[in-house]
Regions:
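Active-site helix-to-loop segments that bind/position phosphate- or nucleotide-bearing substrates
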Residues: 1-132, 137-166, 177-181
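C-terminal lobe/lid and adjacent interdomain/linker elements of RecA-like ASCE P-loop ATPase modules
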Residues: 171-173
Length: 181
């Protein structure tokens, strides 16, 4: 239903912009993180940093491949980072050759969805006011995703599931609008 909205109204409903005290539209923190440029983001959140590394066992090699938000040749925002990293993670997942009944190949498996959700959750639940950034490290078949901030539910609630306390609910909503998480 939002496809017919004007851009400003769409961004307001998405919570990417809001009216400031002068009545003009300004980006929200969530909007800045999701759609902004890294150099603007770091004006507000100086420790903002997104880092994806593919490492190996050879200590002489720091990494085999790296994407980070300060490269300068892409936006450095969390949505573009998500898309770039998801592509790298997806490429490593083995997908058996199976056709659906309509003849099309199944090209995604549950592991794709789990990796996508883990990355989106790390980005949506991060404490961007913290002292460090988000780090995703792939080493062989292992993947480590860490973000600044502590978990906001009890250990029991975490393991039981179903009780979320998002640190950045508007970022979570934005991921939801692109069918992630």
């Amino acid at each position: 239903p939002w496809n017919s909205l004007e851009n400003d109204e769409f961004l307001m409903k998405l919570r990417a912009v809001a009216k400031n005290k002068n009545g003009a539209l300004s980006p929200t923190i969530a909007g800045l993180l999701f759609f902004g440029e890294a150099y603007h983001i770091t004006e507000i959140l100086p420790n903002y940093f997104l880092d994806y590394r593919e490492e190996c066992d050879d200590k002489a090699i720091r990494w085999l491949f790296r994407i980070h938000s300060n490269e300068g040749d892409w936006s450095g925002n969390i949505y573009d980072f998500f898309c770039k990293v998801r592509t790298r993670m997806d490429d490593e997942v083995a997908v058996p050759f199976v056709n659906r009944r309509d003849g099309y190949r199944i090209d995604r498996v549950d592991v794709h969805d789990a990796l996508e959700e883990a990355l989106a959750n790390a980005l949506a639940h991060a404490n961007y006011y913290g002292r460090r950034g988000i780090l995703v490290v792939k080493k062989g078949k292992e993947l480590s995703i860490s973000n600044p901030g502590t978990i906001r539910v009890t250990k029991e609630e975490f393991y039981a599931g179903g009780n979320s306390d998002p640190r950045n609910p508007n970022i979570l909503k934005m991921f939801g609008f692109v069918n992630v998480g």
